[in-house]
């Protein structure tokens, strides 16, 4: 696939309008997606490639499904694994592709699964249900885990819970995949921390808030017992004042990390920011 780009689009299948994952060839010069095929997955709500790019993982009703990415970009199903919880909403993997982390929005659960040498999904290593109440009874008053990923040094697993306005910090044991709570970052009430990411140099930590509609930037340092974070900036996720229907969704870097992109539901916009990698 040298010099060739593919796009894999996950979709809810319960409506009957989609089968799960749609595979497209990408014509970069023309700026077009060219339909190739569909792969059946029950409600593929989130996709994540392995660190080596050889495997594609999908959320599914049964838990997680693993696909091998073939040389031509097509997908071949490897296996699936149950997570003993409701369907997840976000996936991330360890740098060496030994573990995959599943965020459970509906049941407030973080699940850790082993990954096998061939990339297939293994057994459950650990799972924790969050407890507590949030501040918005009409919407998010109970735990809703929305994003989880390892810190740059992979000593900790950080887990965003937009229902209780917290980012929990778990110590991660690479030997057996077990997690243990060591700290909690308490966010502003009714802010709903939905998504976060780290700069590749490990110096900065970015948090996107769904209801507050802002991005907060933190400095990040490796602490002996817990990570050390300090807020340095807050900026709106939209170019104008958000309306009541606006909800910040996701956030990503450009490949060179000189820009940050943020998508917003409700007003259906994408915001782009210049990024200073020194500050």
Label every model-predicted segment:
Residues 246-279:
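Loop/turn-rich, solvent-exposed surfaces of beta-rich toroidal or solenoidal domains
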Residues 37-42, 80-84, 129, 138-140, ...:
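Surface loop/turn motifs at the tips and blade-to-blade linkers of beta-strand repeat domains
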Residues 76-147:
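Asp-box/WD-like beta-propeller blade repeats and closely related beta-sheet repeat scaffolds
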Residues 45, 89, 146, 194, ...:
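Structural signature of WD-repeat beta-propeller blades
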Residues 24-30, 67-74, 113-122, 171-178, ...:
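Short loop/turn segments immediately following beta-strands, especially the blade-tip
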Residues 4-5, 52-54, 96-98, 153-155, ...:
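Short coil/turn segments that connect the beta-strands within blades of beta-propeller domains
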Residues 9-15, 58-61, 102-105, 159-162, ...:
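Conserved beta-strand positions in repeat-built beta-propeller and related beta-rich domains
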């Amino acid at each position: 696939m040298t010099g060739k780009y593919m796009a894999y689009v996950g979709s809810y299948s319960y409506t009957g309008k989609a089968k799960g994952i749609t595979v497209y060839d990408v014509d970069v010069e023309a700026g077009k997606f060219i339909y190739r095929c569909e792969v059946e997955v029950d409600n593929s709500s989130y996709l994540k490639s392995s660190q080596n790019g050889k495997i594609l993982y999908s959320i599914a009703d049964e838990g997680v499904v693993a696909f091998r990415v073939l040389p031509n970009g097509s997908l071949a199903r490897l296996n699936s694994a149950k997570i003993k919880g409701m369907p997840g909403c976000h996936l991330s993997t360890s740098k060496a592709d030994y573990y995959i982390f599943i965020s459970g929005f509906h049941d407030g659960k973080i699940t850790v699964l082993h990954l096998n040498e061939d990339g297939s999904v293994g057994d459950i290593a650990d799972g924790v249900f969050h407890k507590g109440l949030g501040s918005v009874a009409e919407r998010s008053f109970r735990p809703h885990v929305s994003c989880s990923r390892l810190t740059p040094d992979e000593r900790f697993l950080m887990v965003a819970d937009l229902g209780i306005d917290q980012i929990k910090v778990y110590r991660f044991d690479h030997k057996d995949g077990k997690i243990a709570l060591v700290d909690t970052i308490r966010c502003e009430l009714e802010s709903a921390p939905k998504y976060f990411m780290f700069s590749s140099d490990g110096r900065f930590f970015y948090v996107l808030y769904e209801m507050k509609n802002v991005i907060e930037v933190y400095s990040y340092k490796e602490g002996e017992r817990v990570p050390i974070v300090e807020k340095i900036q807050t900026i709106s996720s939209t170019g104008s004042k958000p309306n009541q229907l606006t909800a910040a969704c996701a956030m990503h870097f450009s490949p060179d990390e000189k820009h940050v992109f943020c998508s917003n539901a409700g007003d259906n916009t994408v915001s782009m920011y210049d990024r200073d990698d020194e500050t």
